[in-house]
């Protein structure tokens, strides 16, 4: 795949932004509820894509949810509970910068959940997502990946750029060494039953 020129990129971006604004207006007018999950490897471009999507949109209609590490209280709750209050209302788009799939990604690979908790997630997630779909939520899921070499290059660039260092946490640096362990995660994300139905 070849890169497009900057001029062509800007031209295409303008066209797509107009379409996004039209889509937003249609969602608002029809009272639709749209939840978009952005998952993937660190430095794969999730944040950049979310930024490009939200820039032309009305923040009263489209919002981003990027939850921090769960509190002790949240850890004691039903796993999906912390996400439920952020789900979209009629006429709203919610973009999740990471989601409940943290359980099968970061939490599993980094040892933040037990094997039993992970297995329960794999059983419960399709049921939870079916509940969302039956309630009228349009659920869209994206998985972003990047090669081991490209991830290393992007991490290095972030370390060198003071304006981007906030994007790297000690956990990101630790997880960098587990690139191979994250590989099966994308398969899990893409093959849970609701993914074929969404």
Which residues does each predicted region cover?
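Charged, amphipathic alpha-helical linker segments immediately N-terminal to NTP-binding catalytic cores
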Residues: 1-12
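Pre-Walker A adenine-sensing motif
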Residues: 21-27
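Glycine-rich phosphate-binding P-loop
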Residues: 38-53
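Short beta-strand-centered segment that lines the nucleotide-binding/catalytic pocket of NTP-utilizing
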Residues: 60-70
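Conserved nucleotide-binding/hydrolysis micro-motifs of P-loop NTPases
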Residues: 70-73, 99-102, 145-152
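Conserved nucleotide-sensing/catalytic segment adjacent to the nucleotide-binding pocket
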Residues: 74-117
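A glycine- and Lys/Arg-enriched "phosphate-lid" helix/loop adjacent to the NTP-binding pocket
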Residues: 108-122, 132-183
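Conserved small/polar residues in nucleotide/adenosyl-binding loops
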Residues: 188-194
């Amino acid at each position: 795949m070849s890169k497009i020129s900057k001029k062509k990129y800007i031209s295409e971006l303008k066209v797509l932004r107009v379409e996004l604004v039209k889509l937003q207006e249609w969602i608002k007018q029809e009272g639709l509820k749209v939840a978009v999950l952005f998952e993937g490897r660190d430095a794969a471009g999730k944040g950049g894509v979310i930024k490009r999507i939200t820039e032309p949109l009305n923040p009263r209609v489209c919002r981003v949810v990027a939850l921090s590490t769960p509190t002790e209280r949240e850890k004691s709750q039903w796993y999906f509970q912390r996400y439920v209050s952020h789900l979209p209302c009629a006429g709203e788009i919610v973009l999740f910068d990471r989601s409940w799939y943290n359980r099968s990604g970061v939490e599993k690979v980094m040892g933040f959940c037990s094997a039993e908790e992970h297995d329960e997630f794999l059983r419960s997630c399709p049921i939870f997502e079916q509940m969302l779909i039956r309630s009228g939520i349009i659920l869209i899921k994206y998985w972003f990946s990047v090669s081991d070499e490209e991830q290393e290059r992007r991490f290095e660039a972030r370390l060198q750029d003071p304006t981007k260092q906030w994007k790297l946490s000690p956990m990101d640096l630790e997880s960098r060494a587990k690139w191979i362990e994250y590989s099966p995660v994308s398969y899990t994300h893409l093959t849970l039953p609701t993914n074929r139905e969404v």
